[in-house]
């Protein structure tokens, strides 16, 4: 039986003794101290992973109880994820760390339909969530023998420079006199999954800011990509991190205050160097550099599959992952054919969306109706081949912990909310034909002939058989 645990809340009645990242900077002027408690146990029969597939926590915000539902982001890492750094003599060193049982989650607040959450549970709960229209952060506090966390609003973070910051891409606005077209007018084939594997490179200044601590840098970037994925899922577009490269022993290009020169140099380096080592479709350069003209990011337009131009550069704006994620999602949007929003563009009733030319405060996590139309128009017209192949398997572990289900189990019963699978018995629910797979839709086998995978090269498309949830390889069709 699942037991619900009560939560004890303690407002800050004791001296502050340090916390993590943002609070440690001393730039937060008001916060609550809370003690989150897990309120849902691992379902029966689930594997004993260190980080469960689904979790639920309860705490209070402004005196009101909050229940945070979390689900592991199984698509965060590509199946061949790697990390690269350089020795002092310039030797390239690449490792392949195990990221199967990772600690990055997305979620929502119970009874708040507009809520979102992007959380890491690596060492306590750290990240941000949207509650009743306001953006909050949560971080573990460094208090001896304590589970204390700090919760604070984005608006309570003091920023060094409040002047408007902007994207360096110019003359790209949505034409204000152009009617907002409906996506239904486009001839889209949503049966074909679009997905991109990205590389994130960090410069030497970013390393210095984080004391050259690769573990801290790694977690920062993972949190950023986790948040970006949340924004792009509303575009029906998948993103996975395939490589993290750190330049802590010196930059491999000339990083300048001129954003265009830095973008150009990074693109040339990607074409001449990075592409030879890592199979990917897009690269983003994260820097602790302040560009001239209040620019915080820049990218090439309509360039997602170009060896030199499928890149963007991103400033470590205020050192906040939410800000960095918004900028990186914005610059990737330009690579994917999306322009800046015009005056008639909205997202959930707001005019402050990801593709606004200036970053909002707090930054938006949503693309506008204009962005959605432009993105899919670009996909339809250009049909960029490098994003058509979703990885055959992103990192995720079935409940049994094996590639295949254990004997006697018909489906992955790790989530009690799976509509196809009975979590108590690991059997398919009555009427269900399947629980997951490229050819499984709403618990039924997909129709025969549906395209389920587009292979690279000249091989024909892989198609569902109508008799299985698996997507067979072409050579097995005959």
UniProtKB/Swiss-Prot annotation:
Motif (Cell attachment site): 456-458
Keywords attached to this entry: Cell adhesion impairing toxin, Disulfide bond, Glycoprotein, Hemostasis impairing toxin, Hydrolase, Metal-binding, Metalloprotease, Platelet aggregation inhibiting toxin, Protease, Secreted, Signal, Toxin, Zinc, Zymogen
Tissue: Expressed by the venom gland.
Family of the protein in this entry: Belongs to the venom metalloproteinase (M12B) family. P-II subfamily. P-IIa sub-subfamily.
Cofactor: Zn(2+)
Residue span, Disintegrin domain: 397-478
Signal peptide range: 1-20
Keyword match Disulfide bond: yes
Ligand binding (Zn(2+)): 330, 334, 340
The protein's Enzyme Commission number: 3.4.24.-
Annotated PANTHER family: ADAM A DISINTEGRIN AND METALLOPROTEASE DOMAIN, DISINTEGRIN AND METALLOPROTEINASE DOMAIN-CONTAINING PROTEIN 28
Name of the protein: Zinc metalloproteinase/disintegrin
UniProt keyword Metal-binding, yes or no: yes
The Peptidase M12B domain, residue ranges: 194-391
Entry GO terms, CC: extracellular region; plasma membrane
Residue ranges of the propeptide: 21-188, 392-407, 476-478
CC cofactor note: Binds 1 zinc ion per subunit.
SS bond list: 207-248, 305-386, 345-370, 347-353, 411-426, 413-421, 420-443, 434-440, 439-464, 452-471
InterPro entries reported in the protein's UniProt record: Disintegrin_CS (IPR018358), Disintegrin_dom (IPR001762), Disintegrin_dom_sf (IPR036436), MetalloPept_cat_dom_sf (IPR024079), Peptidase_M12B (IPR001590), Peptidase_M12B_N (IPR002870), Reprolysin_adamalysin (IPR034027)
């Amino acid at each position: 039986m699942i037991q619900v645990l009560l939560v004890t809340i303690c407002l800050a009645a004791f001296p502050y003794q340090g916390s993590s990242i943002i609070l440690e900077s001393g730039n937060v002027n008001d916060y609550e101290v809370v003690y989150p408690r897990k309120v849902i146990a691992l379902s029966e029969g689930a594997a004993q992973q260190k980080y469960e597939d689904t979790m639920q926590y309860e705490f209070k915000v402004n005196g009101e109880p909050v229940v945070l539902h979390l689900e592991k982001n199984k698509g965060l890492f590509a199946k061949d994820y790697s990390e690269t750094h350089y020795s002092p003599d310039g030797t390239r060193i690449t490792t392949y760390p195990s990221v199967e049982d990772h600690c990055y989650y997305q979620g929502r607040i119970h009874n708040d339909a507009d809520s979102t959450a992007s959380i890491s549970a690596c060492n306590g709960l750290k990240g941000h969530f949207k509650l009743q229209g306001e953006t909050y952060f949560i971080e573990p506090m460094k208090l001896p023998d304590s589970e204390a966390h700090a919760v604070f609003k984005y608006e309570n973070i003091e920023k060094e420079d409040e002047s408007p910051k902007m994207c360096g891409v110019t003359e790209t606005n949505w034409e204000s006199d152009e009617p907002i077209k409906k996506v239904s007018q486009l001839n889209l084939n949503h049966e074909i999954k679009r997905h991109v594997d990205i590389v994130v490179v960090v410069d030497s200044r970013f390393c210095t800011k984080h004391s050259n601590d690769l573990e801290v840098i790694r977690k920062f970037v993972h949190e950023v990509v986790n948040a970006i994925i949340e924004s792009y899922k509303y575009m029906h577009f998948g993103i996975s991190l395939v490589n993290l490269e750190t330049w802590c022993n010196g930059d491999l290009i000339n990083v300048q205050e001129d954003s265009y020169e830095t973008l150009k140099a990074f693109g040339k380096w990607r074409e001449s160097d990075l592409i030879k080592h890592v199979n990917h479709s897009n690269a983003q350069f994260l820097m602790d550099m302040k560009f001239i003209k209040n620019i915080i990011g820049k990218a090439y337009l309509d360039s997602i599959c170009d060896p030199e131009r499928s890149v963007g550069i991103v400033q470590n704006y205020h050192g906040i992952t939410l800000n960095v994620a918004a900028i990186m999602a914005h610059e990737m949007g330009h690579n994917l054919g999306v322009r800046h929003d015009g005056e008639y563009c909205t997202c959930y009733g707001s005019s402050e969306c990801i593709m606004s030319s200036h970053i909002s405060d707090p930054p938006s996590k949503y693309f506008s109706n204009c962005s959605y139309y432009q993105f899919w128009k670009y996909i339809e017209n250009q049909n960029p081949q490098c994003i058509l192949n979703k990885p055959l398997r992103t990192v995720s572990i079935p409940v049994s912990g094996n590639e295949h289900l254990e004997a006697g189990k018909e489906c992955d019963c790790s989530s009690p909310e799976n509509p196809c699978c009975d979590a108590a018995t690991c059997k398919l629910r009555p009427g269900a034909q399947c629980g997951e797979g490229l050819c499984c839709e709403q618990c039924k086998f997909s129709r025969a002939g549906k395209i389920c995978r587009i292979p690279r090269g000249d091989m024909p498309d892989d198609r569902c058989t109508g008799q299985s949830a698996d997507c067979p390889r072409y050579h097995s069709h005959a």
